[in-house]
Swiss-Prot record:
Entry-linked InterPro entries: Xyl_isomerase-like_sf, Xyl_isomerase-like_TIM-brl, XylA_actinobac, Xylose_isomerase
UniProt-listed Enzyme Commission number(s): 5.3.1.5
Active site as annotated: 54, 57
Protein's name in the database: Xylose isomerase
Species whose genome carries this gene: Clavibacter sepedonicus (Clavibacter michiganensis subsp. sepedonicus)
Length: 397
């Protein structure tokens, strides 16, 4: 398999990722700001297909209309010259001091109204650029102190805002869906909708739930100690995987934003296997952008920035290659059958069977030989996982 990225791979990068200057809570920038035109040109040369951005990545918070339009025009020119697309746009409701207690859920009602206006304006820009997804990461929606935030009221204000946005895109006729990005903490001590499961439950309370899905990020779910691949399976099961953020994370700690695959490599392997081979008939289960939300390490210069961008795509393609070999291995197929992996898709009840029928079925309980599972009838899961790891390590062809 070719390891050179192409537009068909649908790799995309956030402008805030390749444009990260290295500043962190303990030190200032180690690199200069990246111009948006250079960013578009370089990711195009590397084989990406898309660029995403927050409004404040493209033009500074508080920019005049003229300054804003200048940057939009420059971006449009670069997109036209390179063929790069904008599949997703988002709004920064976390950096400016006005959002220190959040945007949609700030205790200050005037701030909430300002946040909605900021988002509505950026939705218009997303539609203008042809973006199909609008991501909402509520990085400041939360609290450090239990007494400081009425969570019930905050969730109602969150719901009110998202319902309004759904009305807006519907009335405007925009072909845009929303994707909530969960995160357990950082920058707030506790963030509302901290995990994929919380977000999925919240979506079901909305007036237009069909317009809202999730944008899970590898590191965010792993910060909560969760299995990212399992979470993606549930999002796919519920038809809510509208976008995905790929990066690397090594355990329960701060949000590292490493290159994809440079953290939990085994989980990255199972994720790529799911995305590429987990659909009906073994095809793709998700056909949207493979979006890299990472930070080039603070230690790197501009050469290292582009090396790290290329590394994300190469890691994904390497894992895709390993996953395809894993699926094609006859020994793996035998191990999958022995583990009865496919049997989970067989309904537990027979067609038309009720609880009366299963209660009357002696083979399901009275005559079922449960004792035969002691010292026998192992599932062979360890063998299957060993085969997966050997393929991941390139030990099997």
């Amino acid at each position: 398999m070719a390891l050179t990225p192409t537009r068909e791979d649908k790799f995309s990068f956030g402008l805030w990722t390749i444009g990260y200057t290295g500043a962190d809570p303990f030190g200032g920038p180690t690199r200069s700001d990246l111009d948006v035109v250079e960013g578009v040109e370089r990711i195009s040369e590397l084989g990406a297909y898309g660029l995403t951005f927050h409004d404040d990545d493209l033009f500074a918070f508080g920019s005049t209309d003229a300054e804003r339009q200048t940057q939009i025009d420059r971006l449009k020119g670069a997109l036209s010259d390179t063929g790069i697309v904008v599949p997703m746009v988002t709004t920064n409701l976390f950096s400016a001091p006005v959002f220190k207690d959040g945007g949609f859920t700030s205790n200050d009602r005037a701030v909430r109204r300002f946040a909605i206006r900021k988002v509505l304006r950026n939705i218009d820009l997303a539609a203008e650029l042809g973006a199909k997804t609008f991501v909402m990461w509520g990085g400041r929606e939360g609290a450090e102190y239990d007494s400081a935030k009425d969570v019930r009221g905050a969730l109602e204000r969150y719901r009110e805002a998202v319902n309004l946005l759904g009305d807006y895109v519907t009335d405007k006729g925009y072909d845009i869906r929303f994707a909530i990005e969960p995160k357990p903490n950082e920058p707030r001590g506790d963030i509302l909708l901290p995990t994929l499961g919380h977000a999925l439950a919240f979506i079901e309370t909305l007036e237009r739930p069909e317009l809202v899905g999730v944008n899970p990020e590898v590191g965010h779910e792993q910060m909560a100690g969760l299995n990212f691949t399992a979470g993606i399976m549930q999002a796919l099961y519920q038809g809510k995987l509208f976008h995905i953020d790929l990066n690397g994370q090594r355990g329960i700690k701060y949000d590292q934003d490493l290159v994809f695959g440079h953290g939990d490599l085994q989980n990255a392997f199972s994720l790529v296997d799911l995305l590429e081979n987990g659909g009906v008939g073994g095809g793709r289960s998700y056909d949207g952008p493979r979006h890299f939300d990472y930070k080039p390490s603070r230690t790197e210069d501009i050469t290292g920035v582009w090396d790290s961008a290329a590394a994300n795509m190469r890691m994904y393609l390497l894992l895709k290659e390993r996953a395809q070999a894993f699926r094609a291995d006859p020994e793996v197929q035998e191990a999958l059958a022995a583990a009865k992996v496919a049997e989970i898709d067989t309904p537990t009840l027979n067609e038309g069977e009720s609880y009366d029928d299963i209660l009357a079925d002696r083979s399901s309980y009275e005559d079922f030989a449960a004792d035969e599972y002691f010292d026998a009838k192992g599932f062979g899961f360890v063998r299957l996982n060993q085969l997966a790891l050997e393929h991941l390590m390139g030990a099997r062809s």
